[in-house]
Amino acid sequence: MAQAVEEWYKQMPIITRSYLTAAVVTTVGCSLEIISPYNLYLNPTLVVKQYQFWRLVTNFLYFRKMDLDFLFHMFFLARYCKLLEENSFRGKTADFLYMLLFGATVLTGIVLIGGMIPYLSVSFSKIIFLSNSLTFMMVYVWSKQNPYIHMSFLGLFTFTAAYLPWVLLGFSILVGASAWGDFLGMIAGHAYYFLAFVYPRMTDRRPLKTPSFLKALFADEPVVIARPEDVRFAHAPFDEIHQD
């Protein structure tokens, strides 16, 4: 069993493996009280006035306490991050990393701008961890890239992957969990998909070009293509995106 897990881990592409490792280490560290979540959450005031720039990154790595909800999020992170990196971004590691950086920037911008809007500032001020939103962004982009793959929800009904984000969003609402994480992830995912794939076909222009310094970091090598199968899944609530 341990050998199988080790082999599965080693076969992950570099970005997926790095992000999954950072997320697990950060969350486990907080659970063991080695790291404090108070040093990780997104706080614009501390970032600007006290130069705690690491918060712009660490808020994407913490998935709250170690429980079933955490395992669900790790499943979605490992599965869809890996599928994207090995299929849609095969041989384009730098482009995949740029997608994540773009998504993180959009999500952070939404929270910062939302915090300055009257009547919305209170709600946005509670969004201090965006890890779930970034994961949902990957799910959204994957669903747009693979719209015809058939999926099963709890064995109750089947649907095509194009509807996966909406099924997950609806399930969050159905169980009474906050859908903010899902919704923000959908916004970031749609922004990337439109600018990276739709707009270039419409205008023959590419507004999202991966910086050369990122391309220089990775040698684009062919990887084994992951073949997604029909899956049965349950969606964990995203209520931890809000903090009281």
From Swiss-Prot:
It comes from the Eukaryota. The keyword Membrane applies. It comes from Arabidopsis thaliana (Mouse-ear cress). Signal peptide: none annotated. May be involved in the degradation process of specific misfolded endoplasmic reticulum (ER) luminal proteins. The chain crosses the membrane at residues 22-42, 97-117, 122-142, 153-173. Keywords: Endoplasmic reticulum, Membrane, Transmembrane, Transmembrane helix. GO terms for biological process: response to stress. Residues 43-96, 143-152 are lumenal. Coiled coil: none annotated. This is Derlin-2.1. Residues 1-21, 118-121, 174-244 are cytoplasmic. Belongs to the derlin family. It is a multi-pass membrane protein. Pfam families: DER1 (PF04511). It is found in: Endoplasmic reticulum membrane. InterPro entries: DER1 (IPR007599), Rhomboid-like_sf (IPR035952). GO terms for cellular component: endoplasmic reticulum membrane.
